[in-house]
Amino acid sequence: MIRHAFAPVHEPFADSLALPRRLESATAARAVAITFDDGPHPDGTPRVLEILAAHRAQATFFVIGEQVVRRPELVRRIAEEGHSVQLHGYRHRLQLRLTAGQLRDDIERGTAAIEDAVGASPSLHRPPYGIYSSSGLEIVRARHLRPLLWARWGKDWRKFTTPDRIARRVLSGLRAGDVILLHDADFYSSKRSHERTAQALELIFTELRSRELDTVLAL
């Protein structure tokens, strides 16, 4: 089954499938988009929001529906503080293991959870693990959701990584217009990984300032 996977961060595959990894707007000339997957998390998300506020930065949160249902107040806070709330799915499951019916249900339930929490529908979708099945991609596009992957990632879910390594992975080769992937939750990764992410985020903002790069929403 895995041979049918689409490689999201391998440029030729992503580009051939029209899966964006970079910003398309005019604001991308001097900006990057920081995105967070897997939340909302009771500890990780508030800490990330505090750091974003301290740096007057904007970010996009790809949330998991089952976590939204548990903590709708956190999702409302994300939106109220000027960030974007987008869809990562209702559950964190690999699309290749799901039927078309299961995929449709996952996307519909995830969308409904966001709508109930913030009163608005998501416009972007990112699949768990960054992998679309052919059915999943077709369903997402049929619902007028735009896929968005990433150009740089910190691999911050790993158990033995460090804030410095996370920051270096993000910043190495980073250029204006790139979409950055980080995680504000540890539901589907190593325990308390979001703490390292928060520390890495401070390092990332220090370097973004030195490069005169702003942050924008991934819209």
Where are these regions (language model features)?
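C-terminal domain-boundary segment and adjacent tail
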Residues: F13-T27, V69, K191-L219
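Active-site beta->alpha N-cap acidic-glycine motif
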Residues: H4-L94, Q102, D106-R109, A113, ...
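Metal-dependent catalytic neighborhoods of phosphoester/phosphodiester hydrolases
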Residues: E73-L74, L96-D105, S133-E138, K191
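A cross-domain feature marking catalytic cores of carbohydrate-active enzymes
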Residues: F36-D38, V63-G65, L87-G89, R126-Y129, ...
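His/Asp/Glu-enriched short active-site or ligand-binding loop at hydrolase and phosphoryl-transfer sites
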Residues: I131, L137-G173, L213-L219
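Charged helix-capping and loop-helix junction motifs
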Residues: L103-I107, T161-R168, H194-L201
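A short acidic, helix-capping loop that chelates divalent metal ions and anchors anionic groups
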Residues: R93-L98, D156-R158, F187-K191
